[in-house]
Amino acid sequence: MAKQSMKARDVKRVKLAEKFYTKRVELKKIISDVNASDEDRWDAVLKLQTLPRDSSPSRQRNRCRQTGRPHGVLRKFGLSRIKVREAAMRGEIPGLKKASW
């Protein structure tokens, strides 16, 4: 089990990313615009740097919904590989069965 503080930190990052999403997209659009003046682009870079670090979506971590485990998380289920296996063995995931060949 992950610490509660780590889970809370990830929740905070998700909220910040949602809050600053539009502003971040607008600034990145200005920065990548070739027709914009150098001053405008530089101002956009500086404004982007003033945004909170945790507002960047790349700082979010996929975590298991049940345990909070950060590694081995399957996106399709939102669970770690361990919890997916346990649920599959109990027959709780429809259409998922153990491989046999």
Swiss-Prot record:
Pfam families in the cross-refs: Ribosomal_S14
A cellular component term from Gene Ontology for this protein is: cytoplasm
InterPro entries per the record? Ribosomal_uS14, Ribosomal_uS14_bac/plastid, Ribosomal_uS14_CS
> Molecular function terms in GO for this entry?
rRNA binding; structural constituent of ribosome
User: Which keywords are on file for this protein?
Assistant: Ribonucleoprotein, Ribosomal protein, RNA-binding, rRNA-binding
* Biological process, per Gene Ontology: translation
Subunit arrangement? Part of the 30S ribosomal subunit. Contacts proteins S3 and S10.
Q: Which HAMAP family match?
A: Ribosomal_uS14_1
Family, as annotated: Belongs to the universal ribosomal protein uS14 family.
Return the NCBIfam families for the record: PRK08881.1 (NF006477)
Q: What does this protein do?
A: Binds 16S rRNA, required for the assembly of 30S particles and may also be responsible for determining the conformation of the 16S rRNA at the A site.
The protein's matches in PANTHER family, at most eight in alphabetical order, are given as: 30S RIBOSOMAL PROTEIN S14, SMALL RIBOSOMAL SUBUNIT PROTEIN US14M
State the name under which the record lists this protein: Small ribosomal subunit protein uS14
What gene is behind this protein? rpsN
